[in-house]
């Protein structure tokens, strides 16, 4: 039996209980394939580092654990799994394009951070405009790390 999860576990409040339940319901020799993001790894080229830091700090609240990959292998082991694989899966957009992950993420972040941590709609909009105008000038850069874990249920 195979369990697949992409960008889900970081949103679960009681992750240890969820991993224990996953271990319980998997058949013997079952496998879990989990991909989650460490949101501290996000990098955008910007002219205003202070604003970028404020926006990304507010964005961290969108997940129950925005840094889950740092502890996920240990949590899987404690839940009874044997961790077979840990790999990095980078997302990299060195140029701006409307069809990229990073462009879609800009709008998600603007919606989420507006009216949090003192960020109003004008500041959030200026943040987004700065990134997109960097793209128009040929100065765009985006990188984000996701992490892949493959864990097996011990016999």
Feature-to-residue mapping (PLM):
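Short, small-residue-biased leader/transition segments that mark boundaries at the very start
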Residues: 1-2
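Residues lining the SAM
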Residues: 5-9, 35
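A structural helix-start
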Residues: 12-13
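A short glycine-rich, Lys/Arg-flanked "PGG" loop and its adjoining helix->strand segment in the class I
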Residues: 16-31
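S-adenosyl-L-methionine-dependent methyltransferase catalytic core, i.e., the SAM/SAH-binding region
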Residues: 17, 77, 114-115
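Conserved catalytic/acceptor-binding region of the Class I
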Residues: 31-97
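Core SAM-dependent methyltransferase catalytic element
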Residues: 79-82, 144-155
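C-terminal helical/coil "lid" or tail adjacent to the Rossmann-like core of SAM-dependent
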Residues: 84-140
């Amino acid at each position: 039996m195979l369990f697949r999860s992409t960008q889900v576990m970081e949103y679960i409040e009681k992750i240890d209980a969820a991993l224990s339940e996953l271990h319980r319901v998997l058949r013997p020799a079952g496998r879990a394939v989990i991909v989650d993001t460490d949101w501290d790894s996000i990098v955008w080229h910007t002219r205003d580092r202070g604003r970028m830091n404020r926006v990304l700090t507010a964005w961290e609240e969108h997940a129950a654990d925005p840094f889950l990959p740092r502890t996920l292998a240990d949590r899987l082991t404690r839940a009874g799994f044997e961790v077979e694989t840990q790999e990095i899966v980078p997302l990299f957009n060195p140029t701006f394009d409307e069809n990229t992950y990073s462009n879609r993420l800009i709008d998600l972040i603007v919606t989420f951070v507006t009216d949090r941590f003192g960020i109003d709609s004008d500041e959030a909009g200026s943040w987004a405009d700065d990134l997109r105008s960097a793209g128009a000038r040929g100065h765009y850069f985006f990188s984000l790390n996701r992490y892949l874990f493959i864990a097996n249920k011990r016999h």
